Structures are given as C-alpha cells and as structure tokens.
Regions:
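A detector of single, family-specific signature residues
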Residues: 1-403
C-alpha cells in the first residue's frame, strides 16, 4: 500500500510518497510537467512491488498533463475535489500551507481513503474536444458581454434611446442587427439629416442589403427617437472611429461564438445521444451541444441525484436536535455553466408553454407555479426533474450503443 500525493501547480508538481502509519518513502520533491522529468518519477515507482495509488486535486487545467502521463503508464490516478481536500487539510488548530505540506497531506488522504470506491471514466477525444469548445464558448460569451457594455456606453452618447428597438445577437444566424445599424448610422444626425420619408426608404434599402426584414413602423420609431434624442458627442470622424471600432470588435467576437457553436453541433451529431437530447423540449441547437459538452457521459454519475449535485441545484438536508430544516436553498457547489444552461433551458420552456403542453418538465413547472412558487424557484425545481429524465434517457441510449 503506497500512496503518492501530488500537489499540482502551474508547470510543476510537488510529490510525496507515503506508506501507512506515516512512513515516508520519498520526502516532498518538485517535478516539472515534462516527459523527461516525469519519467524519473515513474522509474522510481516501477521499483515498488506494492499497489500504488496516485492522488491529486482537480486544479483547472494544471493537473491534466501529469494525470494524463501517469494514466498512460497504467497507474491508478485519483483526482479529488479541491473543496474536499481543503476540508481534510484544515482539521487542526494551526493550518500552515506550503507545497511540501500539501503534498504530504494529499498522500495521507490517499491512505485514509484507500478503500473508498472510485469511478474514473475516460472520455474519448470527441467529448474532450466538445468540453473544451464549451468552455471556450462560455469565456467568449463573457467577452461579448463586456464589449456590449462598451458599445452601449458609446451609443448612449451618440444615439441614445435605441436600445430596445433593434434585435440583439442571434445565436442561430450569428447576426446582430443593432450593431450593424449603429455601424452605418453612428450618430443621430446621420438619421435626422434626411426627412422621415427619405430615411424610411433608405432604411428599407439598408435592411434588404443586410438581410433583415424591413418594418416601416420600426423605421419611423428610429427616426422619432433620433430626432428627439440629445447626443453628447459631435458627428465627427473621431466619433465615427469610436463607434465603428467598438462594433468591429463585437463582430469579431460574434463570429467567434458562431464558429464555436457550429463546430460544437458538428461534433455533438457524431455522439449517440445527440438525437435523444435534441428531442427533449426546450433544447435547441444552442443549448443542446453545450449541455452534452458540460455533462459528458452521464453514466459517470452513479445516479441522477449525483448529476443534480454536479449542477449545484441540490438542497442538502439540515437537521439538528429537534430542528429539521424544510426550506432549503440550492447548494451552488457544482458547475456554474450547468446552472446557466438550466436557466436558459427553463426560460425557453416558460416562453413556449403552449407549444410544450403535455411535456412532463413543462407540466411540473406549471404545477409549481400553481402552488404559488416564485418563477425562478419553479424553474430550477423543473430543471431538477429535467436532469433526472436526461440521466435516465441518455444513459439508456449509451448502454444500448455499447451492445
């Protein structure tokens, strides 16, 4: 029984090797995440004839190189949640923290929980790439929000008031009508310099050229807002540069989002559960691939409850003495992306209640609303039910595909 504790950091790891009762075979030592350095470690481990467990924390992407290398060498690698390891480490009155101390504690953890059942699913390349694309989409969407705020602050000085008139970014087409409009009509005077009739004609021509549906009421509304607005920047070349530069950057981000989502759909279509997931109500070409990417193989969760806990929407019981908590809040200990997807999914079901009549998730949502639950409480209660159905259906499909 030999426990290898790995304290992972960027580019290197501090490694300690222990046996039961605190016998230290190797004191903490640093190894770079390179094949030559890790080969020295495996050469030393190969000399042992006892069973070896390697334990490390899940630290974003830092642990992936050493974990992949050791798994390739057929070592039993156990990746532990950092929160669980932190609670294990902080049991004393004094809690010093260094890489060496952490490596010893992780190795000791491996001995204390040696016989704990551990399930390790190895994803294929398609799922790994899909997960990476899903993370990239999430980060790029954050960038888009920042760029939208920048553009909005500029529009408030050049063409205030048009925020809710024009459509925003469309995930399905990759188009953004509002940013396209302000790129060409970057200032209120670029609209009011024409008569209303002349602007409507020009707006119709612009809509046709850009591939948007023309609406005369929309054109008149834009003209009215521009005429009544109070711009605080002049219609100069400098203002034009500021607006168009902000739009140009936003377009590049939009194009990146569209390309990522398109590629995610292409990869997801090659997976056996794609059709089953896309048939579920509320799931479209935007949510579907991202949901598949984030959950991965649902069979890695021992039950639907584990999947719900992974999403962080579980409500753990709380009881002490004669008190039993009945109104519990979500733990929010899981994936933020899963909760974001859950909100998007349930928002779609909420908006299309008539179309989804008879769907068990939609019916459950409406039942909770009828009980007087707040909208978001009902939404995540229904999302809980959705994940139970997802786990059952997709696991069944994947099991059949193996036969």
């Amino acid at each position: 029984m030999i426990s290898v504790g790995v304290d992972v950091s960027k580019g290197k790891s501090t490694i300690c090797i222990l046996k039961p009762y605190g016998e230290m075979i190797m004191s903490p030592k640093d190894y770079e995440h390179t094949q030559s350095d890790l080969k020295k470690l495996t050469d030393q481990l190969d000399d042992f004839e006892e069973e070896i467990h390697v334990t490390m924390e899940s630290t974003g992407n830092y642990h992936l190189p050493i974990a992949a290398y050791l798994k390739k060498k057929n070592y039993d690698v156990r990746i532990v949640n950092p929160l669980e390891m932190k609670r294990y480490r902080c049991q004393g009155l004094r809690n010093p923290k260094t890489d060496s101390i952490d490596a010893v504690m992780i190795a000791q953890y491996g001995i204390d929980f040696w016989f704990r059942p551990f399930r390790d699913y190895v994803d294929d390349n398609e799922r790994i790439e899909l997960k990476a694309l899903g993370m990239q989409y999430h980060k790029t969407m954050k960038t888009r929000k920042d760029r939208c705020l920048v553009l909005e602050s500029i529009i408030d000085r050049t063409l205030p008031g048009i925020g809710g008139i024009l459509n925003d970014y469309d995930k399905h087409t990759g188009k953004d009508k509002k940013s396209d409009f302000v790129y060409d009509f970057y200032h209120a005077e670029k609209i009011t310099v024409h008569s209303e009739k002349r602007f409507c004609a020009r707006y119709a021509s612009w809509s046709k050229k850009k591939g948007y549906r023309y609406s005369e009421d929309e054109a008149r509304q834009l003209y009215s807002i521009a005429k009544d607005s109070i711009p605080t920047l002049p219609p100069s070349e400098n203002t034009k540069l500021i607006v168009q530069d902000a739009v140009r950057i936003l377009r590049e981000v939009d194009a990146s989002l569209y390309d990522i989502l398109t590629r995610m759909n292409e990869i997801a279509k090659s997976l056996p559960e794609y059709t089953t997931v896309m048939e579920m109500k509320g799931v479209g070409i935007s949510i579907g691939p991202r949901l598949i990417a984030e959950i991965g193989d649902p069979r890695r969760f021992h039950s639907a409850k584990a999947l719900i806990a992974y999403a962080g929407i579980d409500a753990p019981p709380y009881q002490s003495g004669r008190f039993t908590g009945t109104e519990r809040h979500m733990s929010k200990r899981g994936s933020r992306i899963m909760r974001k997807l859950g909100f998007e999914l349930m928002d779609a079901i909420n908006k299309h209640q008539k179309s989804y009549a008879g769907d068990p998730v939609c019916e459950y949502f409406l039942a909770k609303r009828a009980e007087g639950k707040k909208c978001r409480v009902a939404m995540f209660a229904a999302y809980n039910k959705f994940l139970r159905i997802y786990h059952s259906r997709v696991s069944s499909v994947l099991n059949e595909s193996v036969k």
